[in-house]
């Protein structure tokens, strides 16, 4: 099984990097300790999709300790091609129905490990996406952002970014609201 790479360009396995200053061992060790004390029983291994939603895998604490902490996890490249209704869209060079929806490796960025206040006994770790040779998936939103930050820094700029949170409150049921949906894609119209 492939070893996880942390905080690219570091290529050391998780258990073989005590001197690398780019690895936040304290966060990884704190997460392992919290799982051992049953303070965390679920770990969300996630990456942002093209709409900024968290995609990934929910794993149990014991499975995280036995496998994920050392090897990371895999997810289907399909997740980078879907619209808001989770319908795969055509025209992607990375992956498609014609090329196949291969898996990519989700390499944990341990600097992002944190407990979630809104989910009891749950931690979250943001991952970088890699192909089967350990190369970054250039079309992944997090990789695109990292490249833009590098470009800005090369020009002497320090990017400062904020996000906007939007939501809707509706006075109807899911069924009546669904009938009124205008989809973002003709492929995902309600039936």
Describe every region a protein language model picked out.
Residues 2-191:
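Glycine-rich, acidic/polar active-site loops that bind/position phosphate-bearing ligands
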């Amino acid at each position: 099984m492939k070893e996880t790479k942390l905080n690219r360009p570091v290529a050391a396995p998780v258990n073989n990097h005590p001197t690398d200053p780019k690895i936040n061992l304290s966060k990884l060790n704190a997460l392992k300790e919290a799982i051992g004390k049953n303070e965390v029983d679920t770990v969300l291994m996630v990456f942002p999709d093209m709409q900024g939603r968290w995609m990934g895998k929910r794993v149990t604490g014991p499975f995280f300790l036995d496998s994920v902490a050392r090897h990371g996890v895999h997810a289907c490249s399909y997740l980078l091609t879907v619209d808001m209704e989770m319908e795969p869209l055509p025209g992607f060079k990375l992956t498609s129905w014609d090329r196949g929806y291969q898996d990519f490796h989700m390499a944990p960025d341990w600097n992002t490990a944190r407990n979630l206040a809104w989910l009891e006994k749950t931690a979250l770790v943001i991952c970088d996406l890699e192909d089967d040779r350990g190369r970054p998936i250039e079309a992944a939103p997090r990789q695109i952002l990292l490249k833009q930050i590098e470009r800005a820094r090369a020009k002497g700029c320090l990017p400062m970014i904020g996000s906007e949170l939007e939501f809707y409150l509706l006075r109807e049921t899911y069924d009546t609201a669904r009938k009124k949906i205008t989809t973002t894609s003709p492929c995902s119209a309600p039936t």
